[in-house]
């Protein structure tokens, strides 16, 4: 009788125990994030500009330290992935509205014809993931910064905090540029090229999302260059001297990103990529001047 009562008690209390476990997990996770976030504002114990390569070499000398870094990386990746999945699940409810907006360059969602029965759900999931990534990007960048924080100076950590909104802004600007500037002429060219075609949702949304994503990533270059020059990984003059190679690389990237084969649409991508590169070079010289001044004062 006692065993039956115990089993009955475990059964009726199981939902409450699960809720308690879930709340403890969530609040523990939040507390862990705040503890990691507090490390961004602690004062430095060492010099201001320790070389990154030397710091990496010291970390690799101790195998135990390597495993600690791997465990920390796993923790930050797990949290970032979990937030990405949660936000993507939330945006799934608004995927139909997002699909309608993305279909405007082709004349509306009615212009798309699904061939396979699972095609619609696949498109919904891809659009939800891209939208979720866009909204989760600030937190993903924060997790990257929290992982790198122990090896950064206080000044670098503060710059990382300020850079989080800049990363999001640049990514969104790249996506907006792809949607409003590049996509309309590209769709007109592809739709009217020799043969009349019935466009599938999967093919249309795949190339639209790829175009917007990679343009968004490309627009992060100036900020990335500023960070690398500030950390002493590269020098600004090297970027200026290699500008001819960068122009060729930008042309190759434009050819890979552009969904059409005409030179007009390629130029629509190529010219902004070159402009983004030279903006990065300008920021690199600003970062180089600031770094040289700090080294002279040290």
Regions found by a protein language model. Give the residues of each.
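Membrane topogenic/interface segments and analogous intrinsically disordered interaction regions
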Residues: 1-298
């Amino acid at each position: 009788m006692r065993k039956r009562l115990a089993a009955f008690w475990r059964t009726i209390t199981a939902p409450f125990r699960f809720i308690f476990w879930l709340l403890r997990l969530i609040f523990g996770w939040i507390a862990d994030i705040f503890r990691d976030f507090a490390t961004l504002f602690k004062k430095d114990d060492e010099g201001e500009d320790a070389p990154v390569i030397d710091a990496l070499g010291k970390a690799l000398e101790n195998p135990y330290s390597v495993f600690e870094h791997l465990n920390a990386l796993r923790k930050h990746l797990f949290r970032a992935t979990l937030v990405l999945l949660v936000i993507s699940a939330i945006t799934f409810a608004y995927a139909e509205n997002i699909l309608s907006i993305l279909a405007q360059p082709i004349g509306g969602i009615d212009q798309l014809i699904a061939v396979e029965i699972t095609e619609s759900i696949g498109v919904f999931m891809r659009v939800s993931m891209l939208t979720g990534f866009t909204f989760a990007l600030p937190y993903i960048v924060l997790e990257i910064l929290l992982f790198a924080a122990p090896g950064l100076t206080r000044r670098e950590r503060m710059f990382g905090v300020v850079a989080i909104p800049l990363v999001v802004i640049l990514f969104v600007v790249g996506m907006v540029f792809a949607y409003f500037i590049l996509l309309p002429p590209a769709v007109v060219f592809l739709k009217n090229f020799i043969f009349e075609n019935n466009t599938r949702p999967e093919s249309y949304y795949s190339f639209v999302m790829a175009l917007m994503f990679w343009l968004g990533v490309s627009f992060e270059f100036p900020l990335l260059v500023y960070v690398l020059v500030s950390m002493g990984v590269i020098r600004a003059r090297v970027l200026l001297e290699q500008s001819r190679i960068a122009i060729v690389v930008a042309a190759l990237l434009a050819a890979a990103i552009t969904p059409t084969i005409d030179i007009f649409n390629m130029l629509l991508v190529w010219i902004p990529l070159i402009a983004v590169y030279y903006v990065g070079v300008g920021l690199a010289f600003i970062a180089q001047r600031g770094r040289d001044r700090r080294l002279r004062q040290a």
